[in-house]
Amino acid sequence: MSDEFSLADALPEQSSAKPPAVTNTKAGHSSQGWPGSSPWSNPSAPPAMPSGLPPSSAAPSTVPFGPVPTGMYPSMPPTGPPPGPPGPFPPPGPSCPPPGVPYPAPAVPGPGPTGPYATPNMPMPELPRPYGAPTDPAAAGSLGPWGPMSSGPWAPGIAGQHPNMPYRSPGPYPTVPPPVSGAPPVPWGTVPPGAWGPAAPYPGPAGSYPTPAPHPALNNPYQVPSGPAGAPPMPGGPHSYH
């Protein structure tokens, strides 16, 4: 056993002064236990592009409605009218005349009147006459606002919407007859003056009424038995047994 002291034997295994063990690895091959470059191990490395998205340098898409839309839903095409200044309203032109201007006369005038109407081939129907009116129009009475009328106050020749209910004639009415001479008229609700005569005695009854009597007992099986007067015993109360 050698008594030589070696400094490498006194240093721990993780010390940097201890020479590392020589491994039999070929040049150009990395260790299997360490991953490749990543943003955590190599901050200067460019970030990796997520799979599924096109690179930023890709050519713009040629779609019929313009460039690729941007926003919350880029896959939905834009809706509505194309961008641009709105057109004038109402549209210019003679489509509608300005307000307050009368319409022009038609270029082609319509047909004028053709003359008197032709005589109808059927006679006009006769108007209904009121009840009791004469058949000959010449014999009818004076024509009033409600049809032919006679001179009497309630003549039968009066016409109207209901011929059987005559209307008063607009002519002069007969004079109201004077009141009959005698007792003066008394206003309603007053007692006329004068004696009313003695008070007559009130007539008595024509005969005497029969004395009331108890009705005869009928053949009723549910007769109430005769007993002492008073209220019947209450149900559930004390009973007297005989």
UniProtKB/Swiss-Prot annotation:
Residues 1-145, 192-242 are annotated as: Disordered. The keyword Signal does not apply. The modification N-acetylserine is found at S2. Residues 44-53, 75-114 have a biased composition (Pro residues). Keywords: Acetylation, Phosphoprotein. The modification Phosphoserine is found at S2, S6, S15. Residues 30-43, 192-210 have a biased composition (Low complexity). It comes from the Eukaryota. Residues 13-29 have a biased composition (Polar residues). Coiled coil: none annotated. Belongs to the MISS family. This is MAPK-interacting and spindle-stabilizing protein-like. It comes from Mus musculus (Mouse). The gene is Mapk1ip1l.
